[in-house]
Amino acid sequence: MYSRRVFLSTAAGAALSAAVKPDKYFKGVIIGAQTYSLRDRDVNQCLTALGELKINTVEMFSGHAEPAFPRGTPREEVRKWRLTVPLGHFTDIRKKYNDAGVTIHAYNYSFREDYSDQEIARGFEFANALGAKIITASSNVSTAKKVDPFAKKAKIRVGMHNHSRIVANEFATPEDFMAAMNGMSKYICINLDIGHFVAANFSPVEFMEKWYPRIVTIHIKDRKKNQGANVAFGDGDTPIKEVLTWMKTNRQAIPANIEYEYKGVDTVTEIRKCVEYCRSIVA
């Protein structure tokens, strides 16, 4: 288990080298990243890469804020860490990122059915300590009811994240989002992954036109229809151009977070291609 000092240690000049222009908009569109894209790096190496990429607003992957628990770690061990870790661990990350010009606008903390009330509450405390106004969650549909009171109390919106595989109690279809939001407060929202949505054979633009007030973040990736593979931006069926153009035309300040998942040669090189592709659309 990492100590805060080890977890956050870095060369003295790292934050300065990562500094980027503090304007999060590009031609009126917020183009950021889900730091899961840089999952092959620790929290400090991730920050350095963001500086190289000139990305200044992120949705933070929980793996960049929590220890790298080995596969198979008992849930009770993870829960114990979450319930006992000082919040200063998260405020230190926030300061390091903010000092480098990077805003953490969302925190990825995936509430599941086996989360205790205390563990749910801590997720909102972590988000607040990071300065995040949004939590994104690869959650269960039924868990929304349990999360809602905590979201209302914290006044932090929770964007439920979809995948492409259509199974009971998981988010994939428009109806799954509707079921989760039905009867809930305005704090239960949508984190729309447009690549997964297309892979499940749904139209992201059509969905956005109807539900944009409840969409708090978007994940940008390219996939083929019919549960197709993740591919380089522009090689799949995902209407990335149409989504970003719609956001620009309608002046939607919804963070569009690049999530790099296809197989490339070098992470930073591939993410740079993704960034350039998105920026070229809205330029």
Residue ranges of predicted features:
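Catalytic-core regions built around general acid/base machinery
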Residues: 82, 88-96, 146-153, 242-246
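Glycine-rich, proline-tolerant flexible connector loops at the mouths of alpha/beta enzymes
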Residues: 61-91
